[in-house]
């Protein structure tokens, strides 16, 4: 009883979280958004089931379908049936396809496993479901899943798939099998290669006419033998003897959720002969086939892989000005999980790049992780009905602006503070962008080095800075005074690499001010263009003023 109460509470919490993210739309706006996406998904369904074609990745289709269902629930509409074919077919299945309930996570699986025993895990092969009917040892009929009760007659197509046994003997001579027709792969690594739109490709091959040769790129994974042997080991042995060897190879006994997680992770990274999108855990003991009905299989569940790419809603478009004055665009997202990382922001790039992407709040974008776990945009998969884009700031900034604070300089000024505090410059541990914003908002810095004047009391009384960290921060600010001259020059934004600056052997501000363009040009990696930039930088009025201020603070190398 406690287990079922826990499951119920989990479901209620999930429902609460789903309601919490309902869009703040008027009824008219909601109707328009739902109607547009519903029509598009219907068109994709028609293409998929009638033509065997798909213009959209399987994973994107699944996530947009889930988004539509969420919107419908939010605004009191009846959710659509998940990808049910427009033409269900006329051939009755001897045994109904039940489908499989998908669990959210390992904890949900653990709760389910407590109520079942003699459990086995299989890969959730990504393809299209089929019924194989054998009578008197021969393949008598092959039926597409359809609506689970009726499907299309695929006998002629399946008879041309060489990997599907056309004759069987022994216990399978008069049997009904259920399985997945899949695209054969050599060494498919799901973690690296993703879904490759396998489901749509298989459907396309099965729907089209006159493609008998390409059918040999398909095979079948049998996952159910209704009314078969009671022992799973006997089932697997008989299937393997009949030619369905993959089922025995990829079915393992499991005792708990940890073992399932281990196998799931192994198959996620291993070379497999098919595309998968998770694992299925099933009890060996099944009801008699006459009790099987679509959507009512309590003896098996699925635990899907997290998609390599996630569809995320754009909540806002924000503009950031870097220390060099370049304007970059960032999309703020409704949170999504990617490889155990919570992603709420993604960098779009320049204003021009943002305009090329044509992204507005309310759009749905496909996000994945690039190298080093950095989120990136792969595609814009759906654009909202009402689209209002913010106006980017005027491009008035450059590498020599905003050393001193002003209202228009807010973002570039903060970027300069973040830069000078970084490890490669002054190495101010324990403070990032949020901390700098808090300090500037409270103490209204005049310029990028004003923090040197803050007292321990001022730091301790700064909202947003924990009192326990204020003393440490003051210590860091004091230590910065001992940093070498070249680090301070880097903090001032000199347009040179650290290697070039070190090679210059400049050790004082006065020496640097008197260095010529020819001197800078002979440094490693510094051409005439960069040398002119250095001259322009050191002759800038703001830079000279900062140099004088640092001299007054007796910073090493700046003293007269």
Curated annotation (Swiss-Prot):
PROSITE patterns with a match to the protein in the record: DNA_LIGASE_N1, DNA_LIGASE_N2
Enzyme Commission identifier(s): 6.5.1.2
Function: Catalyzes the formation of phosphodiester linkages between 5'-phosphoryl and 3'-hydroxyl groups in double-stranded DNA using NAD as a coenzyme and as the energy source for the reaction.
Domain of life: Bacteria
Active site: 124 (n6-amp-lysine intermediate)
Assigned keywords, A-Z: DNA damage, DNA repair, DNA replication, Ligase, NAD
Family note: Belongs to the NAD-dependent DNA ligase family. LigB subfamily.
Annotated GO biological process: DNA repair; DNA replication
Name of the top EC class for this enzyme: ligase
DNA repair is among the record's keywords: yes
Protein name in UniProt: DNA ligase B
Catalytic activity: NAD(+) + (deoxyribonucleotide)n-3'-hydroxyl + 5'-phospho-(deoxyribonucleotide)m = (deoxyribonucleotide)n+m + AMP + beta-nicotinamide D-nucleotide
SUPFAM superfamilies named in the record: DNA ligase/mRNA capping enzyme, catalytic domain (SSF56091), Nucleic acid-binding proteins (SSF50249), RuvA domain 2-like (SSF47781)
GO molecular function, one term: DNA ligase (NAD+) activity
